[in-house]
């Protein structure tokens, strides 16, 4: 199948980016990878394009998008450093080199202490944070397509490495959607029966409770609107690995979990946070021991998590 010579990203390229240079990088990557295939049988270029699309969604700069397109060229093709610097500049070369060096680190370990050391090593090697962002995007797409790797042991090794090294790194960077997806994709490989069982239960609950969760959200919004509090209410569904992790850590059954579905109420000030807490406390009964004040203790995230009986 002939590969298109025109870059077609999943979303339009932002007008602030250098679309011509990105197109040039795409054409160069197509030429470099032209004889290579993925385990799925797709042309290899489909992978760097997917990585670049992920980076575009993060609204990153031109050099980072180009690095996404070229991140495997030095390691897996005949492309040279001189070529990349000549065509795309020193900054891109440094980024591609950084990603290549990270890819060469053997990070698989079952030892928690070693895993933490590997995470520190990766952070230390990523002098430019964009190197780590490209690597995380690379790992995310590889995990999305991991089912095409024929060797089960290799799939499990990659999944373990992802769970122990890359998912926690994404969390440290505040990339919680990345973290959640990497964890669930890894868990699906490492414990498929538990993953399938929990997914079935959560899907059933979603259908069974959908009307109730919508009503609760409407009630909360109406209550806060009456009190003239400007806020945003976002529904949150606990991810499968997070559910499993909580069940294991607390030694509880699925039916004992109280936070599979929750709401985030986002407001403009700390004062409003406490006002909202008081308003909702007056409407519903809080579950004893569930309230935590992460504002007064200067936690990373300024939140007031609480569980209510509705």
Features from the language model and the residues they span:
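Single conserved hydrophobic/aromatic residue that forms the stacking wall/gate
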Residues: 301-310
């Amino acid at each position: 199948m002939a590969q298109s010579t025109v870059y077609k990203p999943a979303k339009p390229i932002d007008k602030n980016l250098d679309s011509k240079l990105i197109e040039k990088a795409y054409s160069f990557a197509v030429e470099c990878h032209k004889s290579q295939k993925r385990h799925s049988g797709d042309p290899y270029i489909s992978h760097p394009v997917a990585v670049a699309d992920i980076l575009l969604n993060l609204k990153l700069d031109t050099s980072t998008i180009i690095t996404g397109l070229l991140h495997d060229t030095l390691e897996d093709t005949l492309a040279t450093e001189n070529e990349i610097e000549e065509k795309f500049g020193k900054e891109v070369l440094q980024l591609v080199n950084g990603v290549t060096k990270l890819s060469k680190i053997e990070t698989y370990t079952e030892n928690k202490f070693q895993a933490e050391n590997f995470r520190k090593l990766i952070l230390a090697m990523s002098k430019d944070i964009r190197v780590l962002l490209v690597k995380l995007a690379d790992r995310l797409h590889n995990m999305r397509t991991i089912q095409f790797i024929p060797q089960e042991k290799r799939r499990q090794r990659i999944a373990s490495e992802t769970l122990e090294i890359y998912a926690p790194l994404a969390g440290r960077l505040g990339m919680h959607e990345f973290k959640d997806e990497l964890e669930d994709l890894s868990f699906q490989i490492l414990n498929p029966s538990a993953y399938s069982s929990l997914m079935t239960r959560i899907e059933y609950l979603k259908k069974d409770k959908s009307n109730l969760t919508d009503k609760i959200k409407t009630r909360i919004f109406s209550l806060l609107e009456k009190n003239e509090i400007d806020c945003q209410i976002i529904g949150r569904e606990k991810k499968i690995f997070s559910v499993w992790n909580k069940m294991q850590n607390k030694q509880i059954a699925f039916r004992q979990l109280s936070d599979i579905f929750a709401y985030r109420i986002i407001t403009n000030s700390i004062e409003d946070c406490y006002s909202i807490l008081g308003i909702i406390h007056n409407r519903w009964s809080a579950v004893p021991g569930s309230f935590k004040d992460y504002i007064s203790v200067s936690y990373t995230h300024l939140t007031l998590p609480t569980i209510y009986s509705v």
